[in-house]
Amino acid sequence: MSASETTPQSNHGIGILGGSFDPVHVGHLWMAESALEQLPIEHVRWIPAATSPLKPHGPVASNEHRLQMLRLALSGQSGLVIDDWELRQDSVSYTLLTLEYLQEQFPDRPLYLIIGADSLASFDRWREPEQILKRCHLAVIARGGDPPPDYSILDGMTDETQIQRIRESQIQMPQIEISSSDLRNRIATGRSIRFRVPHPVATLIDNEKMYRVR
């Protein structure tokens, strides 16, 4: 599956879920499903990053392995699409450039950028955040048990009307204590990742001896 895959045109929006997915886990899947249920979107577009400007060391697994894991995790699931555009750019993954690409692909579809509250807290460090806000709606994940997202960081970047729309696009989901870094540590120390990642993904990780200490 790649960016060349087409989806039916409609007036529904498109959810954008970017990340390293190193590895993809059930928390990511729950985020996407919650977005599908709560936002006016037709599908969630998973966009694995090459190298994040805020994570300059880059992913641990190769691009191909991360794509393989995503394909296995999303196989047969409706409303979930993989877009490898950022990987094919062979450069740092800036959200603004990805949004410009998606606007060219889907000029009449509103874009919803799905981010966590932690990403919102550092939004002022993103490249040209004001331009990002002109090209998409932010949809912030609010996890039960966590402090509510702090939208004050957006003050001065856009007007109050858009900030209110962003608040209304907030996605509710339970708190899930799973992270890719914890999973990599569990694998490196010989602990189980069962039920934390889809079974086919766990099988691939084991077969390819990924994330093991060398």
UniProtKB/Swiss-Prot annotation:
One Pfam family cited in the UniProt record for this chain: CTP_transf_like
The protein's annotated pathway: Cofactor biosynthesis; NAD(+) biosynthesis; deamido-NAD(+) from nicotinate D-ribonucleotide: step 1/1
Entry keywords, A to Z: ATP-binding, NAD, Nucleotide-binding, Nucleotidyltransferase, Pyridine nucleotide biosynthesis, Transferase
Catalytic activity: nicotinate beta-D-ribonucleotide + ATP + H(+) = deamido-NAD(+) + diphosphate
InterPro entries according to UniProt: Cyt_trans-like, NadD/NMNAT, Rossmann-like_a/b/a_fold
UniProt keyword Nucleotide-binding, yes or no: yes
GO biological process: NAD biosynthetic process
GO MF annotation, one: nicotinate-nucleotide adenylyltransferase activity
Superkingdom, taxonomy of origin: Bacteria
Entry EC number(s): 2.7.7.18
Role of this protein: Catalyzes the reversible adenylation of nicotinate mononucleotide (NaMN) to nicotinic acid adenine dinucleotide (NaAD).
Sequence similarity: Belongs to the NadD family.
PANTHER family: NICOTINATE-NUCLEOTIDE ADENYLYLTRANSFERASE-RELATED (PTHR39321), PHOSPHOPANTETHEINE ADENYLYLTRANSFERASE (PTHR39321:SF3)
Protein name according to UniProt: Probable nicotinate-nucleotide adenylyltransferase
High-level lineage: Bacteria, Pseudomonadati, Planctomycetota, Planctomycetia, Pirellulales
Gene that specifies this protein: nadD
